Amino acid sequence: MKDIFNFFEKPKDPLSFSAIRISLASPDKIRQWSHGEVKKPETINYRTFKPERDGLFCAKIFGPVKDYECNCGKYKRMKHRGVVCEKCGVEVIQSKVRRERLGHITLATPVAHIWFLKSLPSRIGNLLDITLKDLEKVLYCESYIVIDPKETTLQRGELLSEDRYHKSMEEFGEEAFLAGMGGEAVLELLKVVGPADKGHGEGVHGLADELRAQMKEATSDAKRKKIAKRLKVVEAFVQSGNKPDWMMLEVIPVIPPDLRPLVPLDGGRFATSDLNDLYRRVINRNNRLKRLQELNAPDIIIRNEKRMLQEAVDALFDNGRRGKTITGPNKRPLKSLSDMLKGKQGRFRQNLLGKRVDYSGRSVIVVGPELKLHQCGLPKIMALELFKPFIYNKLEEKGYVTTIKSAKKMVEKERPEVWDILDEVIREHPVLLNRAPTLHRLGIQAFEPVLIEGKAIQLHPLVCTAFNADFDGDQMAVHVPLSIEAQMEARVLMMSTNNILSPAHGKPIIVPSQDIVLGIYYMTRERAFARGEGKVFASEEEVRAAYDQGEVDLQAKIWVRLDGKRVETTVGRVLLYDIVPKRLPFESINKVMDKKQLQNLIDLTYRLCGEKETVLLADRVRSMGYGNATRAGISIALENMIIPRKKQELLERAMGEVDDIQTQYTEGLITIGERYNKVIDIWAQVTEEVAQEMMSQIGQETAIGTGKDGKREERKQPSFNPIYIMADSGARGSAQQIRQLAGMRGLMAKPSGEIIETPITANFREGLNVLQYFISTHGARKGLADTALKTANSGYLTRRLVDVAQDAIITEYDCGAMDGITLGALVEGGEIIEPMGERILGRVALDDIHDPFASSVLVKANEEIDESKVKLIENAGIDKVKIRSVLTCQARRGICVECYGRDLARGRKVNIGEAVGVIAAQSIGEPGTQLTMRTFHIGGAASRRAEQSTIENRNPGLVKFHNVAVAKKKDGTLIVMNRNGEIIVTDDQGRERERYGVVYGAKLLVRDGQKIETSTLLAEWDPYSMPIITEVAGHVKYGDLVDGVTISEQVDEITGLARKAVIASKDPDARPRISIKDDQGKTRKLANSEADARYMLPEGANLVVNDGDEVDAGDVIAKMPRETTKTKDITGGLPRVAELFEARKPKEHAVISEIDGVVAFGKDTKGKRKVVITPEVDGKLRPDLAKEYLIGKGKHISVHTGDRVRAGEALMDGAANPHDILRVLGEKELARWLVDEVQEVYRLQGVKINDKHIETIVRQMLRRVRIVDVGDTNFLADEQVEKFVFEEENDKVITAGGRPAQGEPLLLGITKASLSTESFISASSFQETTKVLTEAAISGKVDHLRGLKENVIMGRLIPAGTGLPHYKHLDIEVETPVDAVEEAEEALAVASGEE
């Protein structure tokens, strides 16, 4: 391995090394690097501006200030190269050596390196087994430490205070033991590190063996953990070959002076790098200490000086880590060496991961409506500047000029020849356009430049979606790919015409929007009584001719013969059909084409006709859309906002309902929370109704005209109201915005997120009054403030995602995985949210997929499921399919093609070398930012649907109850008595069509096996409270329900009525409950078990029955109010996604059962309730295998005695904890849960992301295992290791006949996962730079440069795509037979002849 400082003889080729190692530098090493010792704190002479000799800028040590010129001026110029001047001692050489030569400072006393002292856990402390506090006492000269106790009773490493030290001296004598203080003492101790009993000599190896022995004997868990921590540090030293005493500094390197420059400003002052100040402090204190030691100064003065030296060195390495931050003259903290690396402005992120580049320019963008999709308009003056070298080259080649200088002059004069040459140079030379922020890879695309006058870049309107660009002043940057390879990649991979599909969801991203949509929508609508209605044409040409003659209107309904069939259509649609590829059926456009339909059209074209046709279609649609939008002449007038006639009536009805609820509340029938929720629901519903009224009124109009028989007639038709057209076509605006313009604004949210219960009944056309205006301002302000904050949050989320996934690259074709995941349709609340077809499209089947009704194989194992296969599977009625997934991929590094499946942006299987991790991160992060920016468009209007409180079916069929326990009331009503019951609706063949979960306490309105029609009400429940229901009839008996102790009569301020609510009691043994007694006063037993009918009441429950009341089975005895609803908005969404990916434990997480079994309640302990789950084995209960869970008093336990629960089921209300899911249900279930949870957040916003992206990130979070049992391996207990390292080590041990280690899967949050990657370069450039580097240096880590980030930092090509290592060594052999050349020449001649 080469030493990095021979790096200063720069390797010409950054590929000449394959790995980088970081380790501690020994004092000898530092002296070896150094070119001389810096003895004086002086920098440069302020009169001559020459560096002082032996100072921080000394030319003798660091090299000459001017090229080939010594300091005193005796030797000048190249001819004396390599001479050392005898007068001033300076070597005559290039001055750039001042960027690479190091010096050193020899310290008068050793000092500790602050990284190894203070970076937790303290490495020095761990090695010596001394606490950090004690260690600091020694280092900062406050206590003595015993170095060698010899024959005395003292221990090695024992601390002695000043008094105790002198007493021991008197007691044992001067020479009897050795103790010291300050750096020397610690250095001595580190030199003799070893097992406690042996004393010296065995070093870290001995210590490691001893610790391992102790580990085996240790009994308590805490002790084991402590030993493991020490062992980890010791092992690191053993394996890296670093010596522990190197953590103390005896020599300090001085970095080259040109990296800490001193610049004279005008007015005789200097601007200097902070490092110079810090070095000066160290040198000053060091020199003073040397002088004091020579003078034999009193101990106390020397001690003080040593402490000050230690502090100065600390500040140099990491200012502010310990004690006061050293500040400069302007009270600004000085930037130490650590600060140079850390953070956004540090070396890693500022200079290595992102650099400024040449051959680039930026300008404002304007729309280029007549560009082709692969073109962009580049201002001439910009092009001239960007392509200068190419122009010079061409000018010389053509003989216009002979030297570069004359070429320069010619270009500056802008002679006509220059413009001709510029045209030639940029022909077919793609340029890259980039719009910041670049949130996904489509933020940089390649275009062919077209020269234009003016100073603004022209951008094709269809790529705006990808760039998220608009023309309100956005700017874009242009970059020129220089090398031929770069040009080729730009053309093949980055050209806008090659990026039609979005990598996030595989649907087209080059989709018409705004004006184009409006134009196409307008031309495909039909208008009643238009000119030429009902005419019949023989062909498309006839229609066009008639339209050009003005015989038919664009929107007239006509009949035309197409492909031998008579079709009813409109003129506009025939004209549109003219521009779509002929392979598409006419049906695909014979409808009103809104934005959605246009997207489908482009998608269909891409699938059927390929890329080229799609691009041509996109450009034609663009031109036609703009043309027709212009002809349509659509504009907005105030009169277009039609206020619904029934609005007033609806409002009055709602007010009446609200009054009724208020009355119920004053009479004490409902709680304040229920009242609030009901009122909010009423208003939400009315707002909806007003909006529907308005839309039906705006969206319908009556056309009057002359019918066929010449009489006047009226026809209803969709309206041509411009506002309606814009929203309906998807060009601009939404129903929600129209609702605010012409309906009513509806409910608004307070800044805290609660909904204000009086809605804004006015709309913008009527105008708002002062109060309404004021309420509106909350939402608008909150929206703007949120946007600013969330953009930052979203950017940070993306950064963490990219960091964790950057080394997920497609590395092999097939990993041979035997395992996969099962996917079905995504169902929520009985609705199919995402059909299975969409979820399995583009995945690879794990096993053969058989048709259940025929014996044929629909899809073979390891075959990609494409669009046609999805149709087959759906038609066969299969509801679950096993597919291969990234989560189960067995590839050691990276992912294999088969497990990943389709590359969404290309519509075919992914290529080897694709950086799928980064794509996944971008796909998840990009909408995050978009969503954050979308809050304020609706102006904070509260969007919440009325709470779901019923279930209706959508398909007719038979009802089946699955796992539903019911109680029958006296009147025959069925009440659901358990939690995971489901109602299934099956069709005639018995195939499941729908499945709905039913809530505990719901009223069933159908019976098992009943035949039902569509939209039958199946069940209903109270959405505002959770009931507690008795299963048996009898008398109510209160238990531990004492007024003022466990229940409080809460008198409602407004109604004056009392209601009883359970409160948290001080008495730990109180168990508030209701028992049901029979007539003899005995507690009733539950129907199917021996348990008593006792119901524990959580705090917050409202009692519905009184002591002694008679109740029937299925009656509600208490209610738990549900939380008052807050608005659902991505504000909750972004932090939610972040907390899922960070795998945080939720604050109030639900306790889940680890086994299947039957519930019972044990005795309460410590104010907590005990839930016991007893498993059944062969139909018998096995109490010896039971699991117990303690649940806090106030929590609502959601299971009841005798319930059967499944492993992984929650026993109480609360959020699920991902770590529990992993432990109980395993990796696949956890992954499924994470994917669904993340998807739900995005779905609320209408954002589509393919599952495989989230799976890729989850795979990266599950890469490690935690060692539970070490076996015969080299792992440490509780150590976290990568899965494949774990498996390899185990294979080795098993082969050798040993006992393998046991591990459990570990879920790491994305930040943790990024920091624990193999590569220390990648981790240190992410976060916690000093910590990562400290750890890496001690263990002498080697970075094999496998990920993307490490390679970017090292300035190499990334090992993905065309940079994959195995492409490096490919030689392409071209065998061209003679006749092939001749053929090609002929073809060329023919082709040019045709043109």
Swiss-Prot record:
Enzymatic reactions: RNA(n) + a ribonucleoside 5'-triphosphate = RNA(n+1) + diphosphate
GO biological process: DNA-templated transcription
Binding residue positions for Zn(2+) 2: 815, 889, 896, 899
Cofactor(s), by name: Mg(2+); Zn(2+)
Subunit and partners: The RNAP catalytic core consists of 2 alpha, 1 beta, 1 beta' and 1 omega subunit. When a sigma factor is associated with the core the holoenzyme is formed, which can initiate transcription.
UniProt superkingdom: Bacteria
GO MF entries: DNA binding; DNA-directed RNA polymerase activity; magnesium ion binding; zinc ion binding
GO cellular-component term (any): DNA-directed RNA polymerase complex
Descriptive protein name: DNA-directed RNA polymerase subunit beta'
Comment on bound cofactor: Binds 1 Mg(2+) ion per subunit. Binds 2 Zn(2+) ions per subunit.
Binding site for Zn(2+) 1: 70, 72, 85, 88
Gene3D superfamilies in the record: 1.10.132.30, 1.10.150.390, 1.10.1790.20, 1.10.40.90, 2.40.40.20, 2.40.50.100, RNA polymerase II, clamp domain (4.10.860.120), RNA polymerase Rpb1, domain 3 (1.10.274.100)
Function: DNA-dependent RNA polymerase catalyzes the transcription of DNA into RNA using the four ribonucleoside triphosphates as substrates.
Record's keyword terms, sorted: DNA-directed RNA polymerase, Magnesium, Metal-binding, Nucleotidyltransferase, Transcription, Transferase, Zinc
Similarity-based family: Belongs to the RNA polymerase beta' chain family.
CDD domains: RNAP_beta'_C, RNAP_beta'_N
EC code: 2.7.7.6
Binding site residues for Mg(2+): 470, 472, 474
